[in-house]
Regions:
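Extracellular/periplasmic metallocenter environments
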Residues: 1-7, 14-18, 26-36, 66, ...
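Contiguous segments within soluble domain cores/interaction surfaces
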Residues: 20-58
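Short amphipathic beta-strand segments in non-cytosolic proteins
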Residues: 43, 61-70
């Protein structure tokens, strides 16, 4: 699974096998202090990416919703290309990016783990 922090874009399959995964990040932002975190969260109770987007759009979230179980938070410093490991159980997961300099959140996509 790969994420490009400059374009806020996930590249990879929509369905992956359960178990250990490598998460590759690429922070090629032209802004020197523009680090980000990629957050992977399991969506519970039939929630979808639209629900995540609605929380972000509301601008009032002060905590993670109970239906979004954080499975991993992966930082990428400016100009870095780190690789992280995570083990995911079956389910549907949302990928969310948070830009560190201003806290802006971007709901990117969902990935199904089988």
């Amino acid at each position: 699974m790969s994420f490009d922090g400059r374009a806020y874009r996930y590249s990879g399959p929509g369905t992956l096998s359960a178990g250990p995964l490598e998460v590759r990040l690429a922070n090629q932002s032209p802004v020197a202090l523009d680090s980000f975190w990629l957050v992977i969260g399991k969506l519970l109770h039939g929630r979808t990416l639209a629900d995540v987007q609605a929380v972000i759009r509301s601008g009032t979230a002060t905590r993670v919703p109970a239906w979004f179980k954080v499975a991993g938070i992966f930082p990428a410093a400016p100009y870095a290309q780190p690789a992280w490991g995570v083990s995911l159980a079956p389910g549907r997961y949302a990928l969310v990016c948070q830009r560190v300099r201003d806290g802006a959140l971007y709901a990117l996509t969902t990935v199904t783990i089988r």
